[in-house]
Amino acid sequence: MQVNGYSWQLAVCRGGQWTANPATGMVGGDGHAGLIAKPGYTLPGANEGALIGRIGSNGTPFLIGAMGQLPRGQQGELQLCINDDLDGRYGAGLSDNQGSLSVEVRFGSL
């Protein structure tokens, strides 16, 4: 999905479950409370398994969770990802992920 950067837009997790690590169980968009992502994750410092977004291939990742405001002033493709170990530094990385989330993007603000 392309975002224009001028309007207030927010992403809302409408359902589903996923996991960055099958041993820790399935979660929604907020991820695993108490499991904080380390360096090398999509967004270090946020919950492991949380819904993360970025705008464009070189955009800075931002937390969406169950509901999050998209940053204004950025144009490009909205990309979504689970907050996981991208390089397999701490485990299997993205290869053991399971599940999916349904996400709606709409105009509005938090």
Question: What is the predicted function of each stretch?
Answer:
Residues 1-110:
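Gly-Asp-aromatic-enriched flexible segments
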